Amino acid sequence: EIEQHFGDTLWLKHQISWFVGYISFSVVLFNYCLYLTGRRESGFIATFVHSIEGRLLFIRSQLMASLIMSVMYVLFFITVVFIGFQARPDYQTVILILKTICINVMMMISLTFMASFRVTFQTASTIYSVLITVCMVLGIVSLKYNDGLVYWINIINPIAIYSTLLQPGIELSYITILVYGLMFIISLISALTFKTEPVWSSQ
């Protein structure tokens, strides 16, 4: 079946949305949230950042760096896939990339609160690894079964949200918008009150 779609740009864009979502969500968790936790636990932030303006500048700088990194990963992935399938990118491919960038910004800001959890670097790494695995598994399960608990979890599943938004003509549910709106507000508050002292310093 795959061989029948060589050179089919439209089919290819529909198939890669899940992978683009996985790559982008990985960057959000590990290049952004985990990095912020790591800088805090290493004592870097407490040593060099002493004001709320400094904290916001540090978080904003890491957000921009992670966004650039995610764009590079996505561009590389799409390039390799299109070359492998002998497909030519069109204007919709550019739109796909731009939409991915916009979703990444939303996800990074909305999930900033996770970096403020008072846990060690190793614990945060474990939490993020489990989280991305669960999100990916539930996303795969939803391809065959998307009822009950699986459906409700996938409403806020970041990878599923990427896939939904990258597909033309599909809209998010009001519950998704409400939940991520609340997460956005919580993340803004957590950025303003971001603790700079590492967890081990208070133990």
Enumerate the language-model features and the residues they cover.
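Junction motif at the cytosolic side of a transmembrane helix
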Residues: 113-117, 178-203
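Transmembrane helix segments
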Residues: 118-153
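Long, highly hydrophobic alpha-helical transmembrane signal-anchor segments
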Residues: 1-11, 102-106
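Long, hydrophobic alpha-helical segments
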Residues: 14-34
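Short hydrophobic, aromatic-rich alpha-helical segments embedded in or entering the lipid bilayer
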Residues: 145-178
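Alpha-helical transmembrane segments and their short interhelical loops
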Residues: 63-125
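Helix-loop-helix units of permease transmembrane domains in multi-pass membrane transporters
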Residues: 31, 35-67
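Short alpha-helical transmembrane interface motifs in multi-pass membrane proteins
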Residues: 25-30, 61, 91-99, 172-175
